[in-house]
Amino acid sequence: MGKEKWCYINSGQCSPAFNMALDECLLNWQSEKKMPPTIRFYEWEVPTLTVGYFQRVEKDINMDVVNEKKYGFVRRQTGGRGVLHDKELTYSVIVSEDHPNMPKTVTEAYRVISQGLLDGFKALGLEAYYAVPKTEADRENLKNPRSGVCFDAPSWYEIVVEGRKIAGSAQTRQKGVILQHGSIPLEIDLDELYDLFLFPNERVKERMKSMFASKAVAINELTDRTFTIEQLIKAFEVGFEKGLDVELVPYELTEEQLHEVQTLAKEKYESKEWNYKK
């Protein structure tokens, strides 16, 4: 028996709405048994702030700055907090909940899927490992994030290097399908990032920023080498094949599929109703 074959899609740079619409369509097609499990890598046409499904824009986000910088803005269908996508590789994994290798609990499925990330970081020569909250207090902290910024604390089975979080991921389960997507940052500009969020005052903002710097890290901060997106793609292709014990088979969307994605992008992910709904 050979390895199970999964689809592999490298979308390159796309618009914020297209990126979110394709992830949703892949979830739908998986649910309808039209496609095998899929690994997707993608980038962003412009630096883009994504917010979690439950996040309240007016409470957390400084939209004046987002608009002033001409950044993209879109709401994800996954939970979690705000992420600035810039100078990063973004990934998504779409697989049926009843896949024989997928555990039933969210955290354990997260661990299985994230093994691909772990092996990808190792392929880059980084000593990555899972963060598991050790104490009851640490576990409680996961339920009460300190700010609207995603990377400010490692959660269950988040991947860390030298004690700092290196990949931010979120998961949703709909229609019997798991969608997990997340960021693999080459660089993080803290000033750019924190200008996009609302804080009670400047002092709180600076405190959060310094806490973030002690808890999160990007790949190029960790090594004398400067990696490119192309090198990341190669490393994480290897990582997911090894971590999930599958063979990735390149896949191109059909014209019909592309049209479905573009329609969903326009009708949902470009709409104010969706993006500002909370």
Curated annotation (Swiss-Prot):
According to the UniProt entry, its GO molecular function terms are:
lipoyl(octanoyl) transferase activity
Which reactions are catalysed by this chain? octanoyl-[ACP] + L-lysyl-[protein] = N(6)-octanoyl-L-lysyl-[protein] + holo-[ACP] + H(+)
Pathway membership, UniProt:
Protein modification; protein lipoylation via endogenous pathway; protein N(6)-(lipoyl)lysine from octanoyl-[acyl-carrier-protein]
Q: Which UniProt keywords apply?
A: Acyltransferase, Transferase
* SUPFAM superfamilies assigned: Class II aaRS and biotin synthetases
Gene3D superfamilies xrefs: Bira Bifunctional Protein, Domain 2
What biological-process terms (Gene Ontology) are attached? Answer: lipoate biosynthetic process; protein modification process
Q: Where is this site: Lowers pKa of active site Cys?
A: K165
Q: Which InterPro entries match?
A: aa-tRNA-synth_II/BPL/LPL, BPL_LPL_catalytic, LipM, Octanoyltrans_LipM/LipL
Which domain of life does the protein's organism represent?
A: Bacteria
What Enzyme Commission number(s) apply to this enzyme? 2.3.1.181
Which residues belong to any copy of the BPL/LPL catalytic domain? 33-248
Instruction: Quote the catalytic residue positions.
Output: C150 (acyl-thioester intermediate)
A further note on this protein reads:
In the reaction, the free carboxyl group of octanoic acid is attached via an amide linkage to the epsilon-amino group of a specific lysine residue of lipoyl domains of lipoate-dependent enzymes. The reaction proceeds via an octanoyl-thioester enzyme intermediate.
Q: What role is this protein assigned? A: Catalyzes the transfer of endogenously produced octanoic acid from octanoyl-acyl-carrier-protein onto the lipoyl domain of GcvH, an intermediate carrier during protein lipoylation.
Assembly: Monomer.
| Family the entry assigns | Belongs to the octanoyltransferase LipM family.
Q: What is this protein called?
A: Octanoyltransferase LipM
